[in-house]
Structure formats: structure tokens, C-alpha cells
From Swiss-Prot:
Organism annotation: Alkalilimnicola ehrlichii (strain ATCC BAA-1101 / DSM 17681 / MLHE-1)
Lipoprotein listed as a keyword: no
Protein name: Endonuclease V
One Pfam family matching this protein: Endonuclease_5
Chain's gene name: nfi
Heme found in the keyword field: no
EC numbers for this chain: 3.1.21.7
GO molecular function, one term: deoxyribonuclease V activity
This protein's UniProt keywords: Cytoplasm, DNA damage, DNA repair, Endonuclease, Hydrolase, Magnesium, Metal-binding, Nuclease
CDD domains: Endonuclease_V (cd06559)
Function as written in the Swiss-Prot or TrEMBL entry: DNA repair enzyme involved in the repair of deaminated bases. Selectively cleaves double-stranded DNA at the second phosphodiester bond 3' to a deoxyinosine leaving behind the intact lesion on the nicked DNA.
Lineage: Bacteria, Pseudomonadati, Pseudomonadota, Gammaproteobacteria, Chromatiales
Amino acid sequence: MGVSIRALHPWAVDAAEGRRLQQTLREQLCLKTPRGFRPRLVAGVDAGVVDGGRTIRAAVVVMSLPDLAVVTQSVARAPAIMPYVPGLLSFRELPGVVRALEQLDVTPELLLCDGQGIAHPRRLGIAAHLGLITDLPAIGVGKSRLVGTYREPRPEKGATSGLYDGHERIGTVLRSRDHVRPLYVSPGHRISHEDAVHWVLTCCTRYRLPEPQRAADRLASAKEAPA
């Protein structure tokens, strides 16, 4: 079954073309949650580099809601056709992520991505980009801030503070566990700011990261796992 991918552009682009594509693609983003949205399958998505930076290793872990039981998982490799360029991570990592998504035997209804959604200088972080090419609701869950200013949220789990670039809200700083560093949550595509926070918290249990993303992170970096 897998996930259907829309071929919106080639992946082999230089930095200038990548930035131009981001400016164009951002116009297609939707920050509204579909009416009656109640996902039953949520996927955590993560990717890293192996082979001295020559290969992208991507992992997707699909869990059921609300019990967060693992339904299936997928690992894939793809050549790193673009070097690391700040702000253009999606062009480097998504070819591997696409392969992993296409290998799934189920179709997730929500994607949680390690990285940014619209909390990005050109409003097209990896979660926004992935949401567009899959046409699935997608949320960026960043471990660190890429852009924007905010006030530190209170120390208890569930505390939030708006993340702003000037007067524009680009995300939410979320305390996902008591007295831990916050997460930087931003809508990617087909999800609102409020619902992005809701579903991230729904997927958080004992740890800082939401369970699907935490599982994908471990799978993407596990050298002993098949790929």
C-alpha cells in the first residue's frame, strides 16, 4: 500500500534552485486541519547519514492511536545527492524518507517529522515539504530552534509559548515533560498550530520526544537494524 508521493520537482538541485523552490512551494501549504480529523495511524519520520555522509538512512515507524502500539516500520537508503546546506535539509533527506514511506504496507494519516514545519526562514522546513509531497497532515517537531523568538514556557508538561518571526506566528514552544528542554512544534501541512500541539502531546508519554518520533530516531540510527 504505502504512501503516494507527488512528484512536484526534481531532487537534484543546487542551493539557489532549492531556495527558489521553497519560496514557490510555500504558497501551496494549508494550515487548517481537515474537518473531523481523528487519525488512527501516526508515523514518526527521521533520517540520518551513513557511509561518511554519502548515504541517507531514513526510518518510518507507524503506531496506532491512542495506544501507541507499533503497527509497522520501514528503513530505506538513498544517495545523499545534496550536501548539507542550512535551510535545505529536506532536499538532502527526503529522497530516503520517500523510499521508506513507499515501502510501508499501511498508509499513516499523520506524520511527525524530526525537524521544522513552517518554523523555517522560507516557511518550508522538512515537515512542510513532506506534507506537500504526500498531501498528508504533517507536523514538525524540532529538538532545537531554527528561527524565531519566544518566551520560555512554564516548567510543567503541556506548558506552551508562541514562536514568532516578527509578528508572524510560526510555531509553538512546548514543554513535553516536566522540567525538560522544550520542543519546537510547527505545522507542516494540513494541520493548525493548536492541533499540532494537541497531537504531539497525545503521542508523548514518559519521554521528551513523542513516541513515534522517538522510535523512528532509534531505528534510523541503529546500525544493527536492516536497511
